[in-house]
A protein has these predicted regions:
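The feature captures the beta-strand-to-loop junction immediately N-terminal to the Walker
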Residues: 36-41
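ABC transporter nucleotide-binding domain
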Residues: 176-263
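Conserved ABC transporter NBD signature motif
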Residues: 62-78
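Catalytic Walker B motif of ABC-type/P-loop ATPase nucleotide-binding domains
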Residues: 158-162
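A short, flexible loop at the N-terminus of ABC-type nucleotide-binding domains that lies
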Residues: 1-4, 9-25
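Conserved ABC ATPase "signature" region
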Residues: 100, 104, 111-129
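C-terminal coupling/interaction segments
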Residues: 265-304
Length: 304
């Protein structure tokens, strides 16, 4: 669905004396039905790549095509579900107003706007916030509103920039479920994030950018779920009995209260985590103890 070939983008320096490369000869293909993560240090080119794919910027070299069209033409004709890293909204808009306005902008028929907004309110757990002004929302709730706005148009191109930023562990886990629900054969999902652990759990592949170059593309947790088991650490407040019941092979981490080491395949661990949260446990942290993606990321950035 997405075809990127030798893509380049340069900017003029502040005083115009030299050019600064933001993207350098990037080639990548994203198939329909695929979830691809985009990772890289600050300044690696992630935002520039997203801006080109959404038609906000034009490349200075190479090309990008989405379903055979130039990005701007695709977005104008078929739309895109986009969550920006920063969500600009009038502070006096209510949650419901923001959703309805965005539904209209996304091309939802007028007669379907109310029902679509209600669906997103229920899906993203915004019922108690629907009449609140945006300025009254917590950071995590505002992020959920951003997700609701991004997904209300139901596009086949989904681009999410730091989607779990500000979410608590409960909604971070719920977001994983949402991504699984979003998958469909014709849809392409791009997730840009600094959170390598989340990308490893969510994506089929992760593209690692560094200084504008695509250093490598790594198979992630979803695609590698049938490979050797992963080792995760979980920190939970006052839930030792639940841990023992849901993860019988869990072992306490020496010297760390309320922290356990889990071993298993990623889908199995995710199911156990969902069960733990549903049982009322307060999950403080859940992350891989050792990550192949993290190793690949470090090697790419360090030039190994």
């Amino acid at each position: 669905m997405i075809e990127i070939a030798a893509l380049g983008k340069t900017y003029r320096s502040l005083f115009g004396s030299r050019t600064v490369p933001a993207l350098d000869n990037v080639t990548l293909r994203v198939a329909p039905g695929e979830v691809v993560g985009v990772a890289g240090p600050n300044g690696a080119g992630k935002s520039t790549l997203i801006s080109i794919l959404l038609g906000f910027l034009k490349p200075t070299g190479g090309q990008a095509r989405i379903a055979g069209q130039a990005p701007r033409a695709y977005v104008e004709s078929r739309g895109a579900s986009y969550l920006p890293e920063l969500l600009p909204l009038p502070p006096r808009w209510t949650t419901e107003t923001a959703l309805r306005r965005h539904a209209t902008l996304a091309g939802v028929p007028a007669e379907a706007v109310a029902a679509r907004a209600q669906h997103m309110v229920e899906w993203l757990g915004l019922e108690e916030h629907r009449k609140k002004d945006v300025r009254q929302l917590s950071k995590g709730t505002l992020q959920r509103l951003g997700l609701a706005q991004a997904l209300i148009g139901d596009s086949d191109l989904v681009v999410l920039d730091e989607p779990t930023h500000g979410l608590d562990p409960l909604w971070t886990q719920r977001f994983r479920d949402i991504v699984r629900e979003l998958r469909r054969p014709a849809r392409c999902i791009l997730i840009a994030s600094h959170d390598l652990a989340e990308l490893e759990r969510l994506a089929d592949r992760v593209a690692i950018l560094h200084q504008g170059r695509l250093e490598r593309v790594v198979s992630a947790g979803v695609a590698a779920a049938d490979e050797e088991p992963a080792v995760y650490r979980i920190s939970v407040t006052g839930a030792a009995e639940m841990i023992a019941r849901i993860f019988p092979s869990a072992t306490p981490v020496e010297g760390r209260a309320n922290e356990w080491r889990l071993r298993g395949r990623v889908p199995e661990l995710n199911r156990g985590l969902s069960e733990l949260i549903a049982a009322g446990a307060v999950v403080v942290a859940f992350a891989p103890e050792s990550s192949r993606l993290e190793s690949e990321f470090r090697a790419a950035v360090e030039g190994r």
